[in-house]
Amino acid sequence: MLPPGTATLLTLLLAAGSLGQKPQRPRRPASPISTIQPKANFDAQQFAGTWLLVAVGSACRFLQEQGHRAEATTLHVAPQGTAMAVSTFRKLDGICWQVRQLYGDTGVLGRFLLQARDARGAVHVVVAETDYQSFAVLYLERAGQLSVKLYARSLPVSDSVLSGFEQRVQEAHLTEDQIFYFPKYGFCEAADQFHVLDEVRR
């Protein structure tokens, strides 16, 4: 049985009519991520494998308060039809945990939907940029809040990749102070059966 709050913590870590017409419902503002274009002809097979989390641009209060406690984070990606099975590995209190999730198909290459497992709502995911061999930039949106993540196949990443990421963060109306860089060591490669959070089956 998971310790109290563990599932929540891990999940926190990887949206008048005119006269004589019927009044119309006010239009919902466009979702921030709806304007982000996915990688052209995104290929999930090439994207598969291991990715290391380098940095996150986000206004998330949790990161603002706990960013100094960030742990090295690894993403393992495996295509599953038109969806992607994603496992996130990170430490919590010195113990390696695995979080299993399914990035569901949306009918658009490079655009995915992670179904909600709690009241905070679904997560929209866009793989916006990648060369498949060295880096990837992903956008995630939940409840209208956008974040930008930079992943790499290996570390360190080039200055040009970092500059490109920082530019995207700025274009997402986030500031330099809202960029959090993750540790470059201490990555988990596996977790035992007692430290697996399966978001797919819950």
Curated annotation (Swiss-Prot):
It holds the Pfam family Lipocalin. Disulfide bonds join C96-C188. It is found in: Secreted; Target cell membrane. Gene3D superfamilies: 2.40.128.20. GO terms for biological process: complement activation, alternative pathway; complement activation, classical pathway; killing of cells of another organism; positive regulation of immune response. GO terms for cellular component: blood microparticle; extracellular exosome; extracellular region; membrane attack complex; plasma membrane. Keywords: Complement alternate pathway, Complement pathway, Cytolysis, Disulfide bond, Immunity, Innate immunity, Membrane, Membrane attack complex, Pyrrolidone carboxylic acid, Retinol-binding, Secreted, Signal, Target cell membrane, Target membrane. The modification Pyrrolidone carboxylic acid is found at Q21. It comes from the Eukaryota. One of its GO terms (molecular function) is retinol binding. Residues 1-20 form the signal peptide. InterPro entries: A1-microglobln (IPR002968), C8G (IPR043245), Calycin (IPR012674), Lipocalin_CS (IPR022272), Lipocln_cytosolic_FA-bd_dom (IPR000566). Belongs to the calycin superfamily. Lipocalin family. Component of the membrane attack complex (MAC), a multiprotein complex activated by the complement cascade, which inserts into a target cell membrane and forms a pore, leading to target cell membrane rupture and cell lysis. The MAC is initiated by proteolytic cleavage of C5 into complement C5b in response to the classical, alternative, lectin and GZMK complement pathways. The complement pathways consist in a cascade of proteins that leads to phagocytosis and breakdown of pathogens and signaling that strengthens the adaptive immune system. Heterotrimer of 3 chains: alpha (C8A), beta (C8B) and gamma (C8G); the alpha and gamma chains are disulfide bonded. Component of the membrane attack complex (MAC), composed of complement C5b, C6, C7, C8A, C8B, C8G and multiple copies of the pore-forming subunit C9. This is Complement component C8 gamma chain. It comes from Homo sapiens (Human).
